């Protein structure tokens, strides 16, 4: 199989040599020869292989290899007694041309087997070649990833180790395909990771990408998109730039980027020449982007020359390196007369100084007289040459321990063993490194260098000049100093935005379509919801409310009326005044307990009635107090009881009057159960009915407190008694019955003469009470959603009910007692009853305990008896 591959390669070689024109080759004699592959020329157009001379990536890198070889050959400690030679070719920045050139590296191997043995012809003789070159021990190069991939596929067939100084495609880490390839630079996925971290650092989540055709751009942008997706960064549009695109085609790429106005950041994974053309097209179209560019752009002045305005604000990445001052001195000392070994140097000299050797006007120029910019990967070229030299040095020590020259074990060098045992295991301090730099050259198990990057921004300096400014680095993590970035400084205002959708507010969540992570609609959470995550609102639950940051919930404080609230001040003031007034009336009645007015009023029922009124006022304090089990029990017990005390006394009083006047139709016989003791007993019996109802209510629905939240006002948690408002109605139903009966009796006695005013006052009291209750009950149930209004309504209504009784029944009596004492005497009118002597007898009987006597009068068209205190 290997002989067949060698034969096919030989045919390809002979065909290329026979048909191709003479080519330039840099050859240095040596005991061991290292191949070199550099983009001395830029890629040409459709009609030519090669373009103009590439000063930085071509000439400088090539001279860096020669510089390193000179130093190694003069080093007595590195390969002593062994001289390294070189066989350097021009790739013209094209993979196809590089593959043709690389056939030179394998020509010497075509006459030997993979293990170094010579091929035997069918007739038994050894194969010979008239111009067979010295065998290449290893190759330094190439620059571009697609070039290295093509060359690596060829070199692996002949087990020739290859160390690249600039190829960063992640494909080259695949040791199953590129098992003789190593590099002093890291693969692109480290760079892609650094670029993705930069985007996430500035919160750029929606970007466009541009990649150069070929392995460098395509695999690089694939690695970037993978890292971007892991960080929820989306790509709005992806564009490619080709090798032979026109200016109009580059402008078309810029217009395609402009079609995504939300993606203000464009990520470039392009070659330097493609980046240069893209910037020029951007400037021609007067467009503007924030560029994040790979090391293809790096910190090269040639990329931004003439397009400074379009490049301003760009963030670029470059492999971490340092300039080699010795190389700068070496390169600036070169001229066409002392550097004749480089066959391309005269061509470079002519283009650099715009002179011609034919006209003999090039001698006056010097590289020392012009600005010098050391290409960023010079360090990696030198490290690659030194890595190969150290590997050969270690191999020589292992295989040729007793000689400083090459022994038979290294004639020829076994490429497989050189790569597997020595190149991959090499480790040494980087040559020419600054004293304060800790830089070690070594390879990982994939043959890759260690990933370290410098990060630059391109900014306008003083006097309108532009320059690159280092703003950070990446070494397994991002470190940025934004103070050097003009648009990222605090005084520059908000950062440039590059996102599909604006960030949602604190109380909003994202609503995205399946598969989308960067474009969304913002949906507000309900006031009672918190943000479970950026996509979900979650209900806090009744009694809880989201915190200020909407990251969780807290338990709402329990609301209840406090003594200092405005809702409490009014009812409490009314209740205090009413209670004082009640106590005042009670005191007056006790003081004048034996007077006719007090006696005629029915002293016992009056005191019971005053007790009920006082309870009504006291209920305000019970309802304003903080709900507790004891308070809730008092509310149930006290409200209905206070009313029942009042209305039981009034019902007993009106019933007595009605029975007294109703009995006149059958004679002046004294009605039953109208004595004070009977009246008190009847009143207490009526009150006990209410107490039984309340007791049953307390048993069926045990008192306690509970938290209540209205659906329309979930932010308010009310501490309330646990009874239902409907059950309150059942408790008050009994009092409604008492009021109805009182009102009925008051209505029946409405036509009693003016000299019997007690019935009229009771009637007026009951009519007013009915109005209050008719207004109170609807208001109480309608305002159930607002505990403050409901409680205040309850307190005021109860106090009004007591005030009506106090004002309508006791105020007239109080007026006579205090201001008209002359009327507070017994009247001695003569009886005029048609019942004759019966009246005095009845009067005597009815007057017991009340000091009154019956006198005939007319009520509802009938003759009835009247109290002696008729003026009440």
Curated annotation (Swiss-Prot):
Membrane topology type: Multi-pass membrane protein
UniProt note on tissues of expression: Is widely distributed in the CNS and prominent expression is seen in Golgi cells of the cerebellum and some particular neuronal cells in other brain regions.
Main location as per UniProt: membrane
Transmembrane intervals: 568-590, 605-625, 637-655, 680-700, 726-747, 761-783, 794-819
Function of the protein: Dimeric G protein-coupled receptor which is activated by the excitatory neurotransmitter L-glutamate. Plays critical roles in modulating synaptic transmission and neuronal excitability. Upon activation by glutamate, inhibits presynaptic calcium channels, reducing further glutamate release and dampening excitatory signaling. Mechanistically, ligand binding causes a conformation change that triggers signaling via guanine nucleotide-binding proteins (G proteins) and modulates the activity of down-stream effectors, such as adenylate cyclase.
MF terms in GO: calcium channel regulator activity; group II metabotropic glutamate receptor activity; scaffold protein binding
Subunit structure: Forms heterodimers with GRM3 or GRM4. Interacts with GNAI1. Interacts with TAMALIN. Interacts with HTR2A.
PROSITE patterns: G_PROTEIN_RECEP_F3_1, G_PROTEIN_RECEP_F3_2, G_PROTEIN_RECEP_F3_3, G_PROTEIN_RECEP_F3_4
GO cellular component labels: astrocyte projection; axon; dendrite; glutamatergic synapse; neuron projection; plasma membrane; postsynaptic membrane; presynaptic membrane
Assigned protein family: Belongs to the G-protein coupled receptor 3 family.
Glycosylation sites: 203, 286, 338, 402, 547
The entry's keywords: Cell membrane, Cell projection, Disulfide bond, G-protein coupled receptor, Glycoprotein, Membrane, Receptor, Signal, Synapse, Transducer, Transmembrane, Transmembrane helix
Protein name: Metabotropic glutamate receptor 2
Region (Important for interaction with HTR2A): 677-685
InterPro entries for the chain: ANF_lig-bd_rcpt, GPCR_3, GPCR_3_9-Cys_dom, GPCR_3_9-Cys_sf, GPCR_3_C, GPCR_3_CS, GPCR_3_mGluR2, GPCR_3_mtglu_rcpt
UniProt source species: Rattus norvegicus
Record: residues binding L-glutamate: 57, 61, 145, 166, 168, 295, 377
Topological region Cytoplasmic: 591-604, 656-679, 748-760, 820-872
Annotated GO biological process: behavioral response to nicotine; cellular response to stress; G protein-coupled glutamate receptor signaling pathway; gene expression; glutamate receptor signaling pathway; glutamate secretion; intracellular glutamate homeostasis; long-term synaptic depression
